[in-house]
Amino acid sequence: MENSTGKGTVVLVAFYNKKALGVRYLETALKQAGYHVKNIFYKDFNSVHPKPTTEKELALLRETISACKPVMVGLSVMSSMYLDTVYQVMDSVKQAARAPLLCGGAYATMFPEKLLERGADFVIRSDGEHAIRRLADALVNQTDYQAIPSLAYKEGDQIQVNEIGDILDNVDGYGLPAIQCMDACLIENDALVPGDPQLDTRSYEVIASRGCPFTCSYCCCVNLRRMLPKGVKGVRSRSVKSVIEELRKAKEICKNIVFVHFYDEIFPNIPGWVEEFAAEYDKYIHLPFTIWSHPKMVKLDMLTTLKKVGLTEVIMGIQSGSERVRKDVFHRYETQEDVINAVANIQKAGVFWGTFDLMLQHPFETINDLKESYYLVKRLPGKYELQLHGLNFLPGTDIVDMAIDQGYYTQEELEKIMYAPMDDQFGAYWKQNTTQESQMWYKMIYCWQFKKYRKRLEKFEKNPLAYVGEIEKCYAEAQKLTKLRYLYKKGRVFLYRETKFRG
């Protein structure tokens, strides 16, 4: 419905993410400036079988936007993987309202021209909290917006891209994200569900920092960092006070929370920060939590401190067991011993679960590289979970140019891959299209995470092609065990909460 107070309504649309921290921070910024915000969470996330949008869902979107009579409509375009849905939504927004169409998010930051050429009126790059308020005010007051830092727009046939600016080094200044969006809905499965879909969540997602200190070639974070103005740190951590305040409010509002997931690229390990965080978390939050980290950042003292107050899982990228691939292809400079020591630290600290990512079977990898991944996994101590997947070529990442320069793809071939329909992109992420020998090494890596197969695997590794049937059988069993282990893991985390924090 049309807002009857304040300066007007801004509609924000988030794609394939019911929690969508970006639009939640923007809601806070806009409300502080006197705007009513309508948040539309468009589609839920499914990494294995993502669902394209339907005409019924687009019709529901148009009806919702039309009823708001918005000042402008903002789309959070974080990834290229769902651009087919974004473009259909852009067309629907143009049909539903005369309001200007704005895009922001990681993909929009890196490729403002593409979205402007596709029909967006404006793009905001990098942090949007200040720029979106200034743009909304300019539109409402019919004043000039051309000098707004971080703004991109079309002037006639020319695209103007302003320098990124007016962003905070101290991100506490942006306030807290909207834990409960007061005027929100979810559009999914051809239906509109009123209310904030986060309210019923059992796991709450929070970031304690923005940015990443590393230079991984397959990730856009390094290039987003390079765009920041001089004097703005590449990694900006929130204060402990700000993080704890958000979590305390989340516990009050989202009554079903049993778990906290820190979605930082790398969980902060600033001297003094972890100790202060642990003390405050232990005092007020009392929930098990998981973090993402990196072999260079997994320190025993940090993990021991965090484990005492609820850390139950560390998710860490190994990405390849080949030092050549890690260093020369992925631009990751940890050694084999760094990886093994990081895993050992997780075990020594007594953290319940370690989950490690590997990106395998891509053009840069030889069969010997794949074997090195197997033999590194064999050296990892203790129990752990492996997440094996492929390599996605994402626009704006350094590895795209590397693949072209080294002759694996032409520019045209990669453009087709990177901008394929969503189903094709996610299918490629999980697809295994390699030689039989490669398949056997891949499946042996997968099976090694289960102790019951290890003696057999040591026999198979001598000549995998002589044991194809047996490896396939172990792999099929291991996939079933993975599903059972998931249920065990969730149950143990719940019991951990009940016994540690309520016992």
Q: Where do the model's predicted regions map?
A:
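Hydrophobic/aromatic residues located in beta-strands of well-ordered beta-sheets
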Residues: 10, 101, 148-149, 260, ...
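Flexible glycine/acidic-rich beta-alpha junction loops that bind and position SAM and/or redox cofactors
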Residues: 46, 112, 156, 214, ...
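Acidic, low-complexity intrinsically disordered segments
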Residues: 2-244
